[in-house]
């Protein structure tokens, strides 16, 4: 087969052959196989060229994808599949990128966890789930998590939540709110409970009464649209009790309110 045309198309070259076949190749392919118009290729040379062309093109795609941020082996492989790179070529590209240290799942997991320690708010359980979603194996994640102390991060997150809700909730509800938020973020129950120890939940009676008055007004506006009489009173009691207010305080307020 003879090359009848070589035409540059942005980052690729269009190769046309005298058997009406055509393909796109990278500049590396042109150089490696010393391609030029009228050059004759046998079947083996053509197959070698096609293989190298896709390998070169796929690797360039992968390096472009990696130029934005670190990626896992799986993320790179999935990206190449979207660009219709063949599976055996993808395997070769992944191997090359690993050997050249462009991708390393263990380093990616370590970086992700360290960045979370500095700027994030996720506990170990959520971190592991996020990394598993990136295609990183548990055996690359677990050793790093086991060596990471999440105590200070849990305290930082709990302090932030405390500052946000302390003027909105009574002590019991505030503790429950912070604990549940930490569990949702992936911290263990023991660590969530421990993080509460450095917070001051003391509120004077007037502060609690003011919060109760405010919450009672809010719940009344909401529930009085649907209920009245005894049912309204029961609904108000239940709503306020769930918010963490003392039963005697609620009953006292309701007697004077309704």
UniProtKB/Swiss-Prot annotation:
Keyword Cytoplasm: yes
Subcellular location: Cytoplasm
This protein's GO CC annotations: cytoplasm
Superkingdom of origin organism: Bacteria
Family statement drawn from the similarity comment of this UniProt entry: Belongs to the RecX family.
Organism: Streptococcus pyogenes serotype M2 (strain MGAS10270)
Name this protein carries in UniProt: Regulatory protein RecX
BP terms from Gene Ontology: regulation of DNA repair
Keyword Cytoplasm appears in the UniProt entry: yes
Known role: Modulates RecA activity.
InterPro entries: RecX_HTH_1st, RecX_HTH_2nd, RecX_HTH_3rd, Regulatory_RecX, WH-like_DNA-bd_sf
Pfam families (UniProt xref): RecX_HTH1, RecX_HTH2, RecX_HTH3
Keyword tags: Cytoplasm
């Amino acid at each position: 087969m003879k090359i009848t045309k070589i035409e540059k198309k942005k980052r690729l070259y269009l190769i046309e052959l005298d058997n009406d076949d055509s393909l796109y190749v990278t500049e590396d392919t042109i150089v490696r196989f010393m391609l030029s118009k009228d050059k004759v290729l046998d079947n083996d040379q053509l197959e070698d060229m096609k293989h190298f062309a896709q390998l070169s093109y796929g690797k360039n795609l992968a390096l472009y994808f990696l130029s934005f941020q670190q990626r896992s082996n799986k993320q790179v492989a999935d990206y190449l599949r979207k660009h219709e790179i063949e599976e055996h070529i993808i395997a070769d590209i992944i191997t090359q990128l690993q050997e050249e240290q462009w991708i390393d799942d263990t380093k990616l997991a370590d970086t992700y966890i360290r960045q979370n320690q500095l700027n994030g708010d996720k506990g170990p359980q959520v971190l592991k789930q996020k990394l598993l979603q990136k295609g990183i194996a548990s055996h690359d994640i677990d050793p790093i998590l086991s060596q990471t102390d999440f105590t200070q991060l849990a305290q930082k997150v709990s302090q932030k939540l405390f500052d946000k809700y302390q003027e909105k909730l009574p002590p019991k509800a505030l503790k429950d709110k912070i604990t549940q938020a930490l569990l949702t973020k992936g911290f263990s129950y023991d660590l969530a409970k421990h993080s509460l120890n450095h917070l001051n939940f003391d509120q004077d009676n007037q502060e609690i009464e003011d919060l109760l008055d405010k919450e009672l007004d809010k719940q009344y506006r909401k529930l009085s649209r649907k209920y009245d009489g005894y049912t309204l009173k029961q609904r108000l009691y239940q709503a306020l009790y769930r918010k963490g207010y003392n039963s005697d305080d609620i009953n006292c307020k309701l007697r004077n309110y309704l």
